[in-house]
């Protein structure tokens, strides 16, 4: 009897996993934990507009992963916020650097980043969400609230410490 039950359970499990759930869409995260928006999964993020190719940022871990990608050399990637983000308890390192700043589009999508703390000390240490926005970079539809931005020797700003004709 036990063998028959186990065989039946196994058959049910195999049949269930082979079913097509046409309405469900899988979302693939990359190694950094970020999810890239595609035409197929865009509706899962409740986005208005075409954000295919953008990285969806829903929480502080996503924002940190996005910053890490940019700081590792991917200066032209795009991002869209899908929720308000509370950065309480995090010591922020700006996105990009002053030698080779951010060149992509960062769309806040009407959301805000709150309690971002970026206190920088040392020679030429800038403070802000972004270190430097380069020509043709875009930051839009973004609110900043209750942040602290200090630099002992250089510039500080909530969105960007420096801008080279960004929009």
Each language-model region and where it sits:
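Positively charged n-region of N-terminal signal peptides that target proteins for export
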Residues: 1-5
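Residue-level signature of transmembrane alpha-helix interfaces in integral membrane proteins
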Residues: 18-19, 75
């Amino acid at each position: 009897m036990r063998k028959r039950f186990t065989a039946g359970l196994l058959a049910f499990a195999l049949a269930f996993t082979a079913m097509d759930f046409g309405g469900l869409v899988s979302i693939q995260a990359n190694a950094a934990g970020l999810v890239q928006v595609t035409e197929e999964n865009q509706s899962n993020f409740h986005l208005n507009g075409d954000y295919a190719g953008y990285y969806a940022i829903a929480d502080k871990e996503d924002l940190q992963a996005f910053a890490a990608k940019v700081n590792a050399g991917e200066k032209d990637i795009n991002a869209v916020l899908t929720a308000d983000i509370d950065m309480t308890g995090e010591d922020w390192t700006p996105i990009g650097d002053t030698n080779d700043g951010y060149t992509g589009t960062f769309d806040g999508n009407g959301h805000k980043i709150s309690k971002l703390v970026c206190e920088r000390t040392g020679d030429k240490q800038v403070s802000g969400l972004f270190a430097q926005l380069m020509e043709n970079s875009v930051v839009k539809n973004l609110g900043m609230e209750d942040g602290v931005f200090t630099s002992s020797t250089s510039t500080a700003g909530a969105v960007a410490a420096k801008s080279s004709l960004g929009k």
